């Protein structure tokens, strides 16, 4: 076998392979020998079938398998010998083996480009200190008390105010016809909490208990029901009662009943610990991202097109998926697919460049991912998607997603390594208004 490697670009390689007739014959003979051992033929004992019978009966299958096996063996031999690691599907342009004739084929694939790795150890980075304010603790206490609140009709004869509830029956019409699904009977509508359209709530706030009325409401362009988006309907409303939440005092008994806490003091302690741990992880993640981004923005190397396209498709799918999960249609985004792709392209480029850099660091530092870590990641995915582990594992294996998953885990390890070796300075938390 002879081969010639052509550098099509910094990220593309083309290899032309020539195979002499002798090797072609040996490859065909090896496949025939396997068929003799493994394939039963009526009238012959297993393993005693003449080669001529095997070649006559299974000619097409033998040629196909011999061609595939020879190419796969030689590709692996060339790639390992030249230390080439494809990051794309290997495209093979080949015909079939013909006994007695030379054979040639061409393979094309993409690789990660070579680049000078910048310094990544001991870099300075600021990280916000994890703190929990008294206001945040009060907010948790208020939510807990709200969960224990008793709902009762107000004594005053007036419409509902923000923070109260209106027991309503409503329906909607368009061109005199009722709109299916936009109706409810004796529904307790929280006022001022954003659970319904603002126009609708404002109208409800004009009606006292026992009063009815109707008003025109225009549905927003991104309304969950795309058939109604941007259209105007007539809402008919009856308010049956105006109610308020009567919250209990914050006592040990109340927090025991609400959340199983021993006391108010213990509840505050547990909440503070939980918030602090969560915030510390978030602050660490933010510092790590800032650290890596600072390195990557100085890098400039071409990206393998297949990696870019794969990452871009996933990011666009994520944007559409998030919109759909929040009840919005793709159309409500107000962008064409091409516009959405171009909007996500810079993000995808940074993501791919970051992963390539981190995998380079992982290789330099001899970091690795163990099989049990991959299994753990698959288990987490199964938990998050509420699927059984075997189904998730099969899906990842059948769609060749195990290697990308390992790469992501390896990149995460490299990012953690860079952070652990950074010069981290703790700073006061930045107020929300200052961010």
From Swiss-Prot:
Lineage: Bacteria, Pseudomonadati, Thermodesulfobacteriota, Desulfovibrionia, Desulfovibrionales
Source organism (scientific name): Maridesulfovibrio salexigens (strain ATCC 14822 / DSM 2638 / NCIMB 8403 / VKM B-1763)
GO biological process, one term: protein transport
EC number, as in UniProt: 5.2.1.8
One Pfam family linked to the record: Trigger_N
InterPro entries named among the record's database cross-references: PPIase_dom_sf (IPR046357), PPIase_FKBP_dom (IPR001179), Trig_fac (IPR005215), Trigger_fac_C (IPR008880), Trigger_fac_C_sf (IPR037041), Trigger_fac_ribosome-bd_bac (IPR008881), Trigger_fac_ribosome-bd_sf (IPR036611), Trigger_fact/SurA_dom_sf (IPR027304)
Keyword Cell division part of the UniProt annotation: yes
Catalyses which reaction(s): [protein]-peptidylproline (omega=180) = [protein]-peptidylproline (omega=0)
Known role: Involved in protein export. Acts as a chaperone by maintaining the newly synthesized protein in an open conformation. Functions as a peptidyl-prolyl cis-trans isomerase.
Family matches, as SUPFAM superfamilies: FKBP-like, Triger factor/SurA peptide-binding domain-like, Trigger factor ribosome-binding domain
Keywords of this entry: Cell cycle, Cell division, Chaperone, Cytoplasm, Isomerase, Rotamase
Family of this protein: Belongs to the FKBP-type PPIase family. Tig subfamily.
Comment, domains: Consists of 3 domains; the N-terminus binds the ribosome, the middle domain has PPIase activity, while the C-terminus has intrinsic chaperone activity on its own.
GO (cellular component) term, any one: cytoplasm
Name this protein carries in UniProt: Trigger factor
Chief subcellular location: cytoplasm
Gene Ontology MF terms in the entry: peptidyl-prolyl cis-trans isomerase activity; protein folding chaperone; ribosome binding
Top-level EC class as recorded in UniProt: isomerase
Location of the PPIase FKBP-type domain: 163-248
Annotated compartments: Cytoplasm
């Amino acid at each position: 076998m002879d081969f010639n490697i052509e550098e099509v670009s910094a990220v593309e390689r083309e290899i032309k392979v020539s195979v002499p007739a002798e090797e072609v014959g040996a490859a065909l003979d090896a496949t025939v020998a396997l068929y003799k051992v493994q394939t039963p033929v009526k009238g012959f004992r297993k393993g005693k079938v003449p080669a001529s019978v095997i070649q006559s009966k299974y000619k097409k299958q033998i040629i196909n398998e011999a061609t595939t096996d020879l190419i796969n063996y030689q590709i692996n031999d060339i790639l390992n010998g030249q230390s080439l690691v494809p990051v794309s599907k290997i495209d093979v342009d080949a015909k079939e083996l013909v006994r007695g004739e030379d054979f040639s084929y061409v393979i094309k694939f993409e690789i990660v480009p070579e680049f000078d790795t910048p310094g990544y150890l001991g870099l300075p980075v600021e990280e916000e200190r994890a703190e929990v304010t008294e206001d945040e603790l009060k907010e948790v206490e208020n939510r807990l008390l709200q969960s224990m609140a008793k709902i009762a009709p107000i004594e005053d004869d007036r419409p509902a105010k923000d923070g109260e509830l209106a027991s309503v029956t409503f329906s909607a019409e368009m061109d005199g016809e009722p709109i299916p699904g936009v109706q409810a009977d004796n529904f307790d509508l929280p006022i001022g909490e954003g659970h319904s359209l603002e126009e609708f709530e404002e109208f409800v706030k004009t009606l006292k208990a026992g009063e009815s009325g109707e008003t025109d409401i225009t549905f927003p362009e991104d309304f969950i029901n795309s058939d109604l988006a941007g259209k105007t309907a007539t809402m008919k409303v009856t308010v049956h009662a105006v109610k308020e939440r009567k919250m209990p005092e914050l006592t040990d008994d109340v927090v025991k009943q609400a959340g199983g806490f021993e006391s108010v003091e213990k509840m505050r302690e547990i909440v503070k610990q939980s918030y602090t741990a969560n915030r510390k992880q978030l602050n660490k993640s933010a510092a790590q991202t800032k650290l890596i981004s600072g390195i990557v923005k100085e890098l400039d190397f071409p990206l393998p097109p297949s990696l870019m396209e794969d990452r871009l498709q996933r990011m666009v799918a994520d944007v559409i998926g998030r919109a759909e999960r929040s009840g919005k249609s793709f159309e409500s985004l107000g962008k064409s697919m091409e516009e959405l792709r171009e909007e996500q392209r810079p993000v995808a480029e940074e993501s791919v460049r970051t992963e390539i850099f981190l995998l380079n660091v992982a290789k330099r530092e001899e970091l690795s991912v163990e099989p049990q870590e991959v299994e753990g990641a698959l288990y987490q995915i199964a938990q998050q998607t509420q699927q059984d582990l075997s189904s998730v594992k099969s899906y990842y294996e059948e769609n060749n997603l195990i290697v990308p998953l390992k790469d992501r885990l390896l990149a995460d390890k490299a990012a953690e390594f860079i952070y652990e070796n950074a010069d981290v300075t703790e700073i006061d938390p930045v107020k929300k208004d200052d961010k």
